[in-house]
Amino acid sequence: MKVTIVELVVWLFSVNFFVVVAEESRWTLVDDHYGKNLHESVCYLRCLSNALNKLYSEGERRLFVNEEVYANASRILDDMEGKTGESTTYLSVVSSEMGGENNKLEKLISYGNAMGDLVAKVGGLFAEVNESVRAVREEIPSALIRANKYYTAIAEITRTVWDDVNRPLQQDKATCGDQKVTGVGELKTECGAHTCPLSDGVNESALQKYKGGCLEINVMSGSVSECFNLPRNKLYRSVALSSSHGFLKWYQDEAKRFQLGLRVKNIFGPLIASFGVGQPPSVLAEMINNITSLQSRFNEVHSNFTSILLADNLTADVDNTDSTI
């Protein structure tokens, strides 16, 4: 997934608001009450970034499959309509030339009708594909951009929190001016199942597992490294606030406190709806299989139609119609 400008529905609260204990919180709360710490915060954040990545991948695949099936179905329908039109034109020209050969003429008419029926069936399926790709083109590209921005923002926050978790357990030096916030490799913290309500699926039902539709992280006992929090504060203010169009607020008055709130339902709800438009890949696969099957039957009928024409040595009349039959 490509990194783009951060746009995240995140808000951060003042210190006084966060003195409320976990039992009184209106949202899913991860704090340092009763010995909790940043390790669990990383797990909750990583769950969100993984879920966004999964949504992005599935949305990208839905868009690609819709476009691919549309292109194939359109090509097949155009070919069938072209051959049917040529056959109809030729039939009207040669019917008078066949004289009393009513049996062959009836067969040609029957084959022509069969081709028309098959074209109509493929046309009906194509109309469904067309409606699906129209909806997908309208919704999914912009949803992919939003998902990528949210993913980028949450992944960056996760990375900077992980800097704290990974640091040596020792007091920070008094001077932190040269401290840099950098990546530290793979997360080695073990995460309990309760830290990822979205692990079994990113859907409305899973979002209900977040109390109040939100996640709040509140670490105030000094577990946060001042040396990491100062550049993090600068990073969020210079990058996130300048490009988030008001969706991100950061109030960081204490260098050793980490306070973060995410409107999980507001982030994922619209994305789930947008990525749910159009037909899913499994349905599209069945539709293109049906279209291909109808095309095979059409080709058989068309072959029978042309065989009668060639057997009666009427190719000269075909040339006169400028047909490619």
Swiss-Prot record:
Entry-listed glycosylation sites: 72, 290, 313
Keyword Repeat (UniProt): no
TM ranges: none
Signal peptide from the UniProt entry: 1-23
InterPro entries referenced in this protein's UniProt entry, alphabetically: ESAG
Domain of life, source organism: Eukaryota
Keyword Transmembrane helix: no
Entry-linked Pfam families: ESAG1
Keywords, ordered alphabetically: Glycoprotein, Signal
Described purpose of this protein according to its UniProt entry: Not known but may be related to activation of the variant surface glycoprotein genes.
Name this polypeptide is given: VSG expression site-associated protein 117A
Source organism per UniProt: Trypanosoma brucei brucei
